């Protein structure tokens, strides 16, 4: 299993390897649990939120330590695929 922040970090690294600029812009202040994002995942999570790769859980939270489901991984991977095709 992987956490949501691990999933996003993996996707950001793949995007960077594929030539996408993954420089983080903005912050995660809109999410009440932004402070729970690990330091290693902060830039990746910020990039993923601001590019639409990942969305919150619908309750104002990112749930970075929560387990990433297969559906969440498939959805975020498809969003990254769409970004790479643009």
Per-range role (PLM):
Residues 52:
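Phosphate/pyrophosphate-binding loop motifs in nucleotide- or prenyl diphosphate-using proteins
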Residues 68-72:
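Acidic helix/loop microenvironments that form the catalytic cleft of cell-wall polysaccharide enzymes
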